[in-house]
Amino acid sequence: MNAAAPLPRPTLHARLLAEQALSRAAGAPLVAGNAVELLIDGAAHFAAWQAAIESARTHVFVENYIIADDPVGRELRAALVAAAQRGVRVCVIHDWLGNLGNARAAFWLPLRAAGGEVRVYNRLRADSPFGWISRDHRKLVLVDGVWGSLSGVCAAAKWLGDPTRGVPPWRDTGLVIRGPALGDLEQAYRDSWAGLGAPLDLAATPVPAPAGAIALRVIATHPQTAGLYRLDQLVAAMAQRTLWLTDAYFVGIPTYVQGLVSAARDGVDVRLLVPGSSNLHAVAALSRAGYRPLLEAGIRVFEWNGSMLHAKTAVADDRWARVGSSNLNLSSWLANLELDAAIDNEDFAGLMTEQYERDLANTTEIVLADGRRPRPSGAVPPRPRRAGGSSSRAAAGALRLANTVGAALSNRRVLGPSEGGALLAGGLLLVALAVLAVLLPQLLAWPLALLCGWIGASLLRKRLRLRRRRPPS
């Protein structure tokens, strides 16, 4: 827990204003009376899902970005098949792009044969060249309307790591929720299902009775709604003492980065924990390219030392926490279907703070070149021009070696030219395209012609649809 003195309790009026602002920003009401359990890493999630599905009596709803044809995915499918065979209504939504290369359509034949239903979100369509950008990135399991789990965990074996090769499990976070908030979770699922075909013909589950003392918001975002983005911005503005963020694919846009920078300059302890090694290398390069303005504002940045950090969490002032599927980037904020819970409870926020501190024990802190403290704005002296030579190169090599040894001993790494990787990749790509355009223009002409033709045909098709819908004059 944070050792600083506790913040003074806000007045009732101030608290009501804050709750109103958060509800309006997120587009989600605060629902009291819930019990919440914190799940850490894939194994805990898979065991909880399995036990809940085995206990199902009326219905099981599953929505996940990836359900892979591997031991974890097959075990989940077996539990769903068994539930369907004993008369439970089983409905599954998975993302087309997420499952591409992870499971074929035939993977679901046993469940369909048992009476289960499977729908796929946003297949690639000829009439929508850019429609594939929107993905169903949610991770949700609902059982009988009385048990629910949301998280960042997909149903795939890579979350368990590979003990035979010494690969540790992926680090991820999720929740089990019981209580009235399950009504909002089920409605979010029903909305997703109805967006892919006929609505569920199953009667809505009555709102569960209170199961605990935790108040939370279920934030079910859709493309272009930006509810979670507004909430994240508001939390950055409202934090008074701490704002500790964990994110798998952080690509901060200027407005959000400015919110974090303003909080840090106002004395808030802002921290960002991101992967040290990522399964999406391009995103990791973009993330590192944005470290410098954060560090210069006094924000502390940590990189995870394990195989992959996939959690998406926030905890502020030991009072407020968020857990779910949303990353701090434009894809999650504006393009995807995402699902998060924002929890207003000191005890739960305390658990999240303790977990964050445990996670920091397995990280390397990124620091500016002048050491522990950020360099004040305007304090960087101009670099003198020096003649090159073997001695300067040897000194630079010795400095890099010292930085490496120091990082290993202190769990700190000096921020190098982090923007260089992204700039190098972008520059080489553009130069290569320019060379191709000069030497082999037909190699670029054909893809460009196909893309223009695809977009043009899509626009003409939409125009015909509008014409057919026009009422006769």
Indicate where each model-derived feature is located.
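Charged, low-complexity intrinsically disordered terminal segments
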Residues: M1-Q442, P447-L450, W454-L460, P471
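A cytosolic-side transmembrane-helix exit/cap motif
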Residues: R463-S473
